[in-house]
């Protein structure tokens, strides 16, 4: 009996330590992430009260936001759970007429059905149900052998994965705050340029070192199969000025260069669709991942799709857009959105 009580006490102490540690990390995260936002808001007559986790208009004294989850950028717990659950959020979008890729969920219990019976349309996508930052997202899977190998690898890490139809086009991130579009950036697919001397592997390392020196994310998810399909291997030396794409995981955290898009050039039908998706999940702040051949063309004319919605939104991609030529663009728009 005494041993059982001792075990219970130890478990309680571990739980207390875990909760305390996470609270401290949340406050630290709030402090680090919102430094630039706080400075910009102060320029517009606002201040962030880090104790109350609110944004206050100084001359009015009005609390604009007061949320419990600072690391989720003003979003409540229920909305956070829906956004994190990619199958659920995409199902909500589909029911409400928002274009998303078709998907099914695969786990250890039903994987044989999808391997041996299901009619998979290639190329396809396999990714974690609740992944972030493009981690373990596998796009342009071209055949059954690739599919089986990738599926088995993913199911060693995750309880379930999503199988999606492959969507084509350029990759965009739409930052929405206060039910308004604050900024839009296009992620450029990572590539290398041959110089006639260095191998593919050397060129990739050189580019990653350059990205790291600029405090940007390197391309860690290298797709060697994709590179081989372009006629190259690790040790092969590309011709001078030859452009070789090195990954199909087009994500800022995987070395994709962000380029700002003029919001005024995006048609109203697209902007309304983005905001509708944001509101359906009841979010205050979100990052929509959208794919189309051209975001300035109405989505119903060029098969544009929302890939997913994120509620833990990284502002760094917006700061670094266009080689950091307008690092405060996003935060100035956020400040201007408070019409008091």
Residue positions per predicted region:
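General beta-strand structural signal in soluble alpha/beta enzymes
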Residues: 48-51, 126, 162-163, 288
């Amino acid at each position: 009996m005494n041993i059982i009580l001792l075990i219970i006490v130890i478990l309680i102490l571990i739980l207390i330590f875990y909760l305390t540690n996470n609270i401290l990390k949340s406050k630290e995260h709030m402090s680090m992430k919102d430094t630039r936002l706080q400075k910009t808001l102060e320029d517009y007559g606002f201040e962030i009260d880090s104790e109350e986790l609110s944004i206050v208009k100084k001359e009015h004294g009005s609390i604009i936001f007061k949320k419990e989850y600072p690391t989720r950028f003003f979003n409540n717990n229920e909305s956070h759970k829906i956004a994190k659950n990619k199958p659920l959020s995409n199902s909500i979008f589909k029911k409400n007429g928002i274009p998303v890729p078709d998907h099914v969920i695969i786990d250890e219990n039903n994987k044989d059905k999808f391997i041996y019976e299901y009619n998979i349309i290639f190329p396809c996508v396999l990714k974690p149900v609740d992944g972030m930052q493009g981690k373990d997202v596998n796009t342009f899977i071209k055949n059954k052998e690739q599919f089986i190998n990738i599926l088995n690898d993913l199911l060693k890490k995750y309880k379930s994965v999503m199988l999606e139809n492959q969507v084509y086009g350029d990759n965009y991130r739409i930052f929405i705050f206060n039910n308004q579009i604050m900024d839009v950036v296009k992620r450029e697919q990572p590539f290398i340029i041959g110089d006639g001397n260095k191998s593919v592997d050397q060129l990739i390392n050189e580019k990653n070192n350059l990205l790291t020196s600029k405090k940007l994310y390197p391309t860690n998810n290298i797709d060697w199969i994709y590179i081989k399909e372009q006629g190259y291997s690790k040790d092969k030396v590309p011709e001078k000025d030859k452009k070789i794409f090195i990954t199909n995981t087009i994500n800022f955290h995987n070395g994709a260069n962000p380029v700002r898009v003029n919001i005024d050039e995006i048609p109203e039908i697209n902007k309304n669709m983005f905001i509708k998706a944001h509101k359906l999940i009841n979010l205050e702040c979100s990052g929509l991942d959208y794919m189309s051949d051209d975001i300035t063309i109405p989505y119903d004319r060029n098969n544009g799709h929302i890939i997913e919605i994120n509620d833990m939104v990284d502002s760094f991609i917006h700061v670094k857009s266009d080689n950091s030529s307008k690092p405060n663009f996003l935060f100035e728009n956020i400040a201007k959105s408070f019409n008091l």
